[in-house]
Design a protein with these regions (language model features):
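Short, glycine/charged-enriched secondary-structure capping and boundary segments
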Residues: 77-80, 101-103, 148-151, 176-180, ...
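Acyl-CoA thioester-binding alpha/beta core of soluble enzymes
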Residues: 1-93, 121, 125-133, 152-169, ...
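PLP-dependent aminotransferase-like
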Residues: 78-116
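Short, solvent-exposed loop/turn segments at the edges of secondary structure
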Residues: 99, 105-108, 157, 177-179, ...
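Short beta-alpha connecting loops at secondary-structure transitions
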Residues: 108, 215-218
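N-terminal Rossmann-like NAD(P) cofactor-binding subdomain of oxidoreductases
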Residues: 117, 136-195
């Protein structure tokens, strides 16, 4: 499985599942559990139980969202739906795609922050001093150059829950390479398994001249990793309540792909499921129809309370 680049972007040769599982380049694909590196690195006394009496489970929890596109924003959308104060930061020079931002921006606030600017960087560090959770979704090394590695964050605030995600894992030679769902699907053998031959109408690997690679019908690695990140954040917060210590969870699209391959294949008939609960909210993007979160709190459906805000409309401050 060769690593090549085009205009600075990584490309992957289409891989089969055996090649993916035996390839040493993606060191993080098989490292530890789905959320690796979850050992507690901070220190402190048990936290007081101030959240339980609030309306939602994560009310009063402050989350700094340093993520983009799908996986990370899905994670912080879950945390926001559970009541956390989520402030998403984006670089002014690289605006997010409107559709992705609107889809994952419910219940959050949005601000722009140029970490290369000394004044802005200092303000972000002030926010970090009172944050409970940081979710970071940039490639390896991107935030480290601004002094925002998980180790530095925990040293500055020992009770912090830090969740990081990237494309190719946190060890190995690809740890600092950009990775996206579709590319990881191809490299992991998913595109090979889901390939089709129009002439035979058969799915699966096929050497015929009309065979074409396929893909999952959704960005499954992104969404699965996002929900995994949210679960990791909640787990770290739960540990902090009893120990006072923060910690780090590291996830990646590659590790999620490996997790999917480890699950048994099910050939049973797919059962019909009920349509998800849909709602509508007015927003600066127009009227939005959306699926409510797949979350239940004390037997009640968790619903989004606020539409996505205008992009970059919030102050660099907690609510």
């Amino acid at each position: 499985m060769e690593l090549t680049t085009a205009a600075g972007d990584p490309l992957r040769n289409l891989a089969s599942v055996p090649r993916w599982l035996n390839d040493g380049a993606v060191g993080g694909a098989a490292d530890g559990g789905l959320a690796g590196g979850g050992s507690l690195l901070g220190a402190g006394a048990p936290a007081s139980n101030t959240v339980r009496a609030r309306e939602l489970p994560l009310a009063g929890i402050r989350v700094l969202d340093l993520t983009r596109v799908i996986a990370g924003p899905v994670a912080t959308r879950v945390l926001a739906a559970l009541g956390a104060d989520v402030l998403r930061l984006d670089p002014p020079a690289l605006p997010e795609m409107v559709e992705a931002f609107a889809d994952t921006g419910f219940d959050k606030r949005s601000a722009e922050a140029d970490l290369a600017d000394a004044t802005t960087s200092a303000r972000v560090r002030e926010l970090l001093a009172s944050a409970d959770v940081v979710v970071a979704g940039y490639r390896g090394g991107a935030l480290e150059r601004f002094g925002l590695s998980p180790e530095t964050l925990l040293a500055d605030r020992p009770g912090l829950a830090v969740v990081t995600l990237n494309g190719w894992g946190h060890t190995g030679p690809w740890r600092e390479v950009r990775g996206f769902d579709s590319i990881v699907q191809a490299a992991a053998g998913i595109a090979d398994v889901y390939g089709t031959d129009p002439e035979s109408d058969q799915a699966g690997p096929n050497p015929g001249s009309t065979w074409r690679p396929g893909a999952l019908p959704v960005q499954a690695l992104d969404h699965a990793t996002g929900y995994g990140c949210a679960a990791a954040a909640v787990t770290l917060l739960g540990n902090r309540r009893s120990t006072g210590a923060g910690g780090v969870a590291r996830l990646s699209l590659a590790r999620t792909a490996e997790e999917l391959w480890s699950l048994p294949s099910i050939d049973d008939e797919v059962l019909e499921v009920a349509s998800p609960l849909r709602s509508r909210l007015d927003s600066s993007f127009g009227a939005l129809e959306f699926v409510e979160p797949p979350l239940v709190d004390s037997g009640a459906q968790v619903r989004h309370r606020h539409a996505p805000p205008p992009y970059g409309s919030s102050a660099l401050a907690w609510a």
